[in-house]
Amino acid sequence: MRTIRAATEHLFGLGWKFWRLGICKAVVPLQAAWKAFSQPVPASCNELLTQLLLCVSLASLIAGLAHHWLVSLQLYPLGPPALVTSLCGLFVFLSLGLVPPIRCLFVLSVPTLGSKQGRRLLLSYSAANLAVAVVPNVLGNVRAAGQVLSCVTEGSLESLLNTTYQLRQAARELGPASRAGSRSLTFEVEGKGSAFRLHMHTITQEILEDFSGLEFLARAALGTQRVVTGLFLLGLLGESAWYLHRYLTDLRFDNIYATRQLVRQLAQAGATHLLTSPPPWLLQTAQPKLSREELLSCLLRLGLLALLLVATAVTVASDYGAFLLAQAAVAWAQKLPTVPITLTVKYDASYKVLDFILFVLNQPPVESVFASMQRSFQWELRFTPHDCHLPQAQPPRVTAALAAGALQLLAGATLVLQAYAWRLRHTIAASFFPDQEARRLSHLQARLQRRHNQSDHLNKQPGTMATRESRKPGQGTRTLESQGPQAHDSLGPPYDLE
């Protein structure tokens, strides 16, 4: 058993070692590509080629996404979006290749998706996806069910009127024979069949017009959603630009991270004691942790997103329900049989002369036939007319529903990863502007040094006041408490980034 256990542990150790080795080998080219992409001026031909290749790839990706957004999702025609996306891709390539801050701004927009503006963009795109694909599909299936009902109603009405007409024809052909027997046979329909048909047609048209109104509202909502999505996208880029501007102009902005570069700088200066008791606002980037308040805020916002997921699930369920309803209605209408009807009318008229004498003589009566007629009438009962087209049920848009749900789940994930997104933005900006990051680290080191000197000064004050305590007991404690929490950190809390 010990041998098997040792062999298993050895295999797990080798597997973990090879896994780490593979990860390290995979990270090396990624680090080289990131270094080339973040360089303002490439240092070699390899970095230049890598930078151009990345710029072309990103420009193609942006152009492809824009074309998909304009054509496939937002229902634009095929002509203008192709030209617009081509010009957009060329502009993005030139901007990324020639202007390094634009590259930084583009990369900063990725972690900015974890902010409130990014969540709004994701949720807006999700709602647009549902409005384009799922809602019209639901309305189309409900309209198909209404069209089936209209066809069956019209066919049943025509069959009823046709039956009445055939009975009237039978009564008309039996007219001479029935008049010979001093009786008449008539069939009438109370009311006008044309008026009833017109009334049913009017009701059906009103129902279809109601659904057309809903489709118009859906298209109007789609147009509004296009504008809102564009505004959110501009807001996302604007927030990234605002962060980059504050990073480059304000040394105190978002300067609350104990990075590895800061640790090395303090070690070189022999000031590692500044991190022995760090202030509460200093964040360790190597081991980021969320506070209790941040976790509670995430849970509350996740509850709101859960309600949105429930609404999306109800919409998708409505899509499936409308599809099943339309499918069942169309299948039921197609299976309605054509009922053949044959009406055979036989009419015999006879009379008897002095039948009471034959009755007294116990003789059978003698009947004289003076009129006899037999007719057959054939027609069919059709519940669906020939000229009525039965529409096909539209299957649910599974891909659109999954995409909308995935975007909403991604928006929920950004709530938890929001704190890490802020750290990632700082890391990205530091990679593109190392000189500015060096100035910011020097400012942070000076800030920590001032706080440490002030703490040492406060620690020396109780000893001084202790010499006077014999004359005025409690005076030292009151002097320390009178300085308030500002005495521990006169610089105050960091900037509130939200």
UniProtKB/Swiss-Prot annotation:
Induction: Up-regulated during osteoclast and foreign body giant cells (FBGCs) differentiation by TNFSF11 and cytokines. Down-regulated by estrogen.
GO CC field: membrane
Keyword field: Differentiation, Membrane, Transmembrane, Transmembrane helix
Residues in the Extracellular compartment per record: 73-81, 143-226, 325-401
Free-text tissue specificity from the UniProt record: Expressed in osteoclast (at protein level). Ubiquitous. Highly expressed in multi-nuclear osteoclast cells compared to mono-nuclear macrophages. Expressed in foreign body giant cells (FBGCs).
Pfam families given in the database record: DC_STAMP (PF07782)
Residues spanning the membrane: 52-72, 82-102, 122-142, 227-247, 304-324, 402-422
Region feature (Disordered): 449-498
Phenotype reported upon loss of the gene: Mice show a lack of multi-nuclear osteoclast and foreign body giant cell formation and a bone-resorbing efficiency reduction.
Compartments reported by the entry: Membrane
Single Gene Ontology BP annotation: multinuclear osteoclast differentiation
Cytoplasmic side: 1-51, 103-121, 248-303, 423-498
Entries under InterPro entries matching the protein: CSR-E3_Ligase_Protein, DC_STAMP-like
Membrane topology (UniProt): Multi-pass membrane protein
Bias-annotated ranges (Polar residues): 476-485
Alphabetized PANTHER family for the sequence: DENDRITIC CELL-SPECIFIC TRANSMEMBRANE PROTEIN, OSTEOCLAST STIMULATORY TRANSMEMBRANE PROTEIN
Function noted in UniProt: Probable cell surface receptor that plays a role in cellular fusion and cell differentiation. Cooperates with DCSTAMP in modulating cell-cell fusion in both osteoclasts and foreign body giant cells (FBGCs). Involved in osteoclast bone resorption. Promotes osteoclast differentiation and may play a role in the multinucleated osteoclast maturation.
Protein name per Swiss-Prot or TrEMBL: Osteoclast stimulatory transmembrane protein
